[in-house]
């Protein structure tokens, strides 16, 4: 009986020491994985996965290791995670996913990886927008091209009643990047007369802001005021 109790006691002590050692070494395998992913330590990410770290282990904000890697545009770490089967559509508490975030931020290398591994083109962010809409707003020309080529709906309307075309005009600066984006959207057959929630058309918005080049593009495409 005494030996049994001693054995049980030693087992408990061993478990506590193991836990303390893990914390001293940087926490659980999962917390180490998230940190390695966020900091672009691709070899460490691979090692932790080999040790059994859970691929989709989330932090308090619901962010997976892949989303954390995407936040910092850590391409190689993201590649290791995606090759291991990480979910490119897993959303956090504010409805960002690796695919949506890469598109919104113009992280094109990671975006290409997500597109090649099952990105849900119809998924939307907390504003009800596809990846194309914030990409258009922020002037990410190549990202817009990638998303159009992938098949994202160009006339999707978000919760603000804006399309990618409207957002490129309303929140853009009228400079060359946004001119190029408007051109790409028109080439993709975006509806140039699809108005916002107040009935204001893309052409009217362009005129109000004095965006001459965008006005010309819209008018040539058949836009009405």
List where the protein language model places each region.
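Ankyrin repeat A-helix N-terminal signature
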Residues: 35-40, 68-74, 101-107, 134-140, ...
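Leucine-rich solenoid repeat scaffolds
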Residues: 193-225
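Intrinsically disordered, low-complexity regulatory segments in ankyrin-centric signaling systems
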Residues: 2, 6, 10, 22-51, ...
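Ankyrin repeat structural motif
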Residues: 41-49, 74-82, 107-115, 140-148, ...
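N-terminal, post-signal-peptide region of Sec/Tat-exported proteins
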Residues: 47-77
């Amino acid at each position: 009986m005494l030996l049994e109790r001693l054995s049980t006691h030693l087992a408990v002590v061993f478990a506590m020491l193991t836990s303390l050692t893990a914390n001293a070494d940087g926490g659980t395998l999962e917390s180490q994985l998230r940190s390695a992913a966020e900091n672009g330590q691709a070899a460490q990410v691979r090692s932790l996965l080999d040790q059994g770290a859970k691929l989709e282990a989330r932090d308090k904000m619901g962010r997976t290791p892949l989303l954390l890697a995407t936040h910092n545009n850590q391409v190689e770490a993201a590649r290791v995670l995606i090759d291991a089967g990480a979910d490119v559509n897993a959303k956090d508490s504010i409805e960002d996913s690796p695919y949506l975030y890469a598109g919104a931020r113009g992280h094109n290398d990671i975006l290409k990886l997500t597109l090649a591994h099952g990105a849900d083109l119809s998924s939307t962010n907390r504003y009800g927008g596809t990846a194309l809409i914030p990409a258009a707003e922020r002037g990410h020309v190549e990202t817009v091209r990638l998303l159009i080529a992938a098949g994202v709906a160009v006339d999707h309307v978000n919760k603000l009643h804006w399309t990618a075309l409207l957002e490129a005009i309303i929140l853009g600066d009228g400079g060359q990047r946004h001119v190029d984006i408007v051109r790409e959207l028109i080439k993709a057959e975006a509806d140039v007369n699809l108005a916002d929630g107040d009935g204001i058309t893309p052409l009217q918005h362009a005129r109000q802001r004095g965006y001459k080049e965008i006005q010309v593009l819209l008018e040539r495409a058949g836009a009405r005021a």
